[in-house]
């Protein structure tokens, strides 16, 4: 579950790439819940279990006219996994899932950004639990413009799915719990 969460965070980072007229660099604004990386996985096939990574950092570039030039980079502290249940979180941090003692960070680095009818497809490499695999996120620009403090911001939402076994997370959670859905929302502040 935690591995899925990490993947979700990585996917979220990828989605943070989106557009302005010139390729501008944005720093992800984590303060005040302006950005989050969440995940969900089926619990016994009956309901959803939600979680998040509370400690991450990243940046993205955004050029509305040339999405192919966009980049997304995110680093996630895997120890920050949070499902609002201390014992489960401890288990997720263990060798059976995220193995945070050996792999304290997960990273996402985009390799391709393409415009589509709904927004942007962001493809990148997610490194989680010591394994690097390509991940695809579907992203939408939620808005952009000047903020009240003299800065310029752009926001994106994204989602994608990862398979636990792809990242060497082999604990059997049942047939309904083999994939983790990543849910990302990011707001970036443009560098001055």
UniProtKB/Swiss-Prot annotation:
Per its UniProt entry, which superkingdom is the organism in? Bacteria
Q: SUPFAM superfamilies this protein is in?
A: YceI-like
Q: Does the keyword Zinc apply?
A: no
| Any GO CC annotation of this UniProt entry | periplasmic space
From which residue to which does the signal peptide run?
1-23
Signal: present as a keyword of the record?
A: yes
- Similarity comment text for this entry: Belongs to the UPF0312 family. Type 1 subfamily.
What's the protein name?
UPF0312 protein YE1254
Q: What organism does this protein naturally occur in?
A: Yersinia enterocolitica serotype O:8 / biotype 1B (strain NCTC 13174 / 8081)
